[in-house]
Amino acid sequence: MKEKPIFPLLLSMSLPMVISMAVNSLYNIVDSYFVAKISEDAMTALSLVFPIQNFINAVAIGFGVGINAMIAQYLGAGRRDKADEALTQGMVLAVIHGIVMMILCIIGIPYFLRLFTTDANVIALGVRYATIVFSFSVILSVNLTFEKMNQAIGNMKITMISLLIGCVLNIILDPMIIFGIGPFPELGIAGAALATGFGQCVPIVIYIAAYLKRPKRVAFRREYLHLTREVTKRLYSIGVPAILNMALTSVLTTALNAILAAFSQTYVLVLGIYYKLQTFLYMPANGIIQGMRPLIGYNYGAGEHKRVEQLYRLTLLLNICIMTAGMILCLTIPGKLMGAFAENPQTIQNGVIALHIICFGFILSAVSVTACGALEGLGKGIPSLLISLSRYVVLIIPLALIFSRFFGAAGVWHAFCVTETLSAVFAVIIYRRSVKAESFIEAE
């Protein structure tokens, strides 16, 4: 990880993640497509559940980032014993997180949905979907711990294969369970939730089989099952900011849903569809960041500061290219993108307007997301969190409130663009200040 040329090394680490995450995004698109065929109420319910579903993912993925960073840094420093300790205690805590999230979210989802709609059918559909999906929270947490472990040691192929098989199973099961094809009963939105859960079970089997069969660069060890203050504190110091980074999307979505609901339920649906599309458009960039993060952590642990900065700059360039392609898609075929999830002409038209406005912030968003990923890889969780706070809370929510008073729902879409511009400037400042003490950036 500290000797190979930067570009092929980053590609070898990122490409499997880009492929697997692209397929995962495709699943989310397909899942939403089939749910939209049930009814517009079902799609609205899915959109309203999304913030809580995203929060559960944020806890699992964000804490996994802490596990990933510690393993990579300890291996880079030649401390295999500490890497094993971080992995073992990280898994114990991940299981605890999954249990707590499952219980709290299942209990709280009916009350959450009533904050945004009084439609009894939408609430019933949302509760039905969420109860099933949230029941798989422990499985999700264990899955993501294995995923981050494999990423930390550079074993991207296992991660790719596991995600691919799980996502393909989801895509196959979705229409069969939703609409009652073949031997399956017609379960509607509950079928979509079950397909998601079943798809999450398969990767665990693959991860365990690979772990037992392959030579272990890092391993679970019984003597490390007892939680220690040092490791737990370190895991949370990296993991909590990463969790908050991702959970802020839920805060933002919830706030924007409340603002848009005052105009029309249609705009809530448009926002939900946009986030489905955004997931697909941003996934290649996120895949590259997934590949960059352990490389930066490993080279940081090995004292290769120059390579850390080279990895950051190359990742930023690649992500700018990806975001440019996303902007072009939203400008050229917005109607087709929205039409995949909505049949109402007014909903599609409102969505086209939203995409035309929001997409101009895509390119600048590459600066913020790349800086966050690099700082997380370095174990600098607080600076990364500050960047995310600017994007998801501090700027966009007040701007959306103000702009919506003057421009209606369109003001919310304009708030996205202004926020990405200001956040990009802030991200550059935070990143450079954070790494200056480490002498990553060479004097010009």
Predicted regions, residues:
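Short alpha-helical transmembrane segments in multi-pass integral membrane proteins
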Residues: 1-14, 71-138, 184-240, 296-361, ...
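Transmembrane alpha-helix boundary and packing residues in multipass membrane permease domains
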Residues: 17, 21, 33, 69, ...
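Short runs within selected transmembrane alpha-helices of multi-pass transporters and secretion channels
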Residues: 64, 68, 133-151, 159-167, ...
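Transmembrane helical elements of multi-pass membrane transporters/channels
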Residues: 12-31, 132, 166, 199-203, ...
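Helix-terminus/linker motif at the lipid-water interface of multi-pass membrane proteins
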Residues: 22, 26-44, 113-120, 176-187, ...
